[in-house]
Amino acid sequence: YTLSLHDALPILGIFVANQQSIEGAMIQMLSHGIVSAALFLCVGVIYDRAHTRDIKFYGGLVNRMPHYAVAFMIFMLASVGLPGTSGFVGEFLIILGAFKFNTSLAFFAATGIILTAVYMLYLYKRIIFGIITNEKLKNILDLNRREKAIIIPLIIVVILMGIFPNIFLEP
């Protein structure tokens, strides 16, 4: 469902058709591509170790996989649009452009963003914190060098896009 909102926001930005919303749509599409790929990569990491996608079997991963927990947190926060990450820039510009066009439209879009943030943060809490109940997770290993070599550049891009968005907007 979060992917649906992140697909709808750039469409809103394109149809509002002012400079802020168009720039926001471009950044949001780029950010969404990177962050979604990173989140799927994070899911793949724990699936590779536990061989289940069922969320109820996860919990307490921060105790066994602290590097994974940090990487997953960064991508999750970028997905919900935390300032300083790539997700914030696109969402902010789209909402700003939508607000200039129609305040009600901007309000509904912002409400969707907030509801998505609640869902994503609950998901993060459920997977990362708590106690380990699945026996397969008792000896689970943290990120290896190969996984870090893939994840760290994605983290750098997500943060660079959030701090220096003009790099991606200037011709």
Predicted regions and their residues:
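Glycine- and aromatic-enriched alpha-helical transmembrane segments of multi-pass membrane proteins
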Residues: 142-170
